């Protein structure tokens, strides 16, 4: 199983989209970076979980895996939901484009399920307004 290829298929398009915004929005992944402590700036936190990673196939040249993708958008609290919703729209557009990508002959083929959310939350203590979406995914690594 090629976990890094699956992560890259999800992470790279999201990272590119948020880095292309003006100003660029920092993205933190659960596998390589940590969110800065006590930050009041906006940022995106992406978590990828693996569920079934040994789904049987008819060929040894194909690996199938399933899991979940959770995207949290953190924006400055007290400024309204508009910026958070704009960043969530960026994430949703990327996820929808992944479902419209043709199946390659080699590499990683990714399909996402229904997108849940957005849901919004904030606490009295935290400096952020948080928007969240999540979805299940199915990946096929073709060799």
Regions found by a protein language model. Give the residues of each.
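Small/polar-rich, solvent-exposed N-terminal microdomains that initiate assembly or binding
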Residues: 1-61, 98-106
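Oligomerization/assembly interface segments of phage tail-like spikes and tubes
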Residues: 61-79, 128-140
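Short, charged, solvent-exposed linker or helix-capping segments at domain edges/interfaces
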Residues: 57-59, 83, 143
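Mid-chain, well-packed structural core segment of small domains
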Residues: 74-92
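Short, well-ordered turn and helix-capping elements at secondary-structure junctions
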Residues: 50-54, 77, 116-119
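Conserved acidic
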Residues: 2, 6, 83, 127
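Acidic-leaning, charged glycine-interspersed low-complexity segments
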Residues: 92-143
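Residue-level detection of beta-strand scaffold positions
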Residues: 14, 48-50, 66, 88, ...
């Amino acid at each position: 199983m090629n976990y890094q290829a699956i992560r890259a298929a999800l992470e790279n398009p999201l990272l590119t989209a948020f880095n292309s915004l003006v100003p660029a929005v920092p993205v933190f992944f659960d596998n390589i970076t940590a969110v800065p402590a006590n930050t009041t700036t906006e940022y995106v936190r992406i978590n990828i979980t693996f569920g079934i990673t040994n789904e049987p196939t008819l060929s040894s040249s194909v690996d199938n895996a399933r899991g979940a993708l959770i995207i949290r958008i953190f924006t400055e609290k007290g400024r309204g939901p508009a910026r958070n919703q704009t960043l969530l729209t960026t994430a949703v557009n990327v996820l929808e484009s992944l479902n419209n990508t043709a199946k390659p002959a080699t590499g990683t083929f990714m399909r996402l399920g229904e997108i849940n959310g957005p849901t919004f939350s904030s606490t009295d203590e935290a400096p952020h307004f948080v928007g969240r979406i999540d979805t299940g995914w199915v990946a096929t690594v073709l060799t």
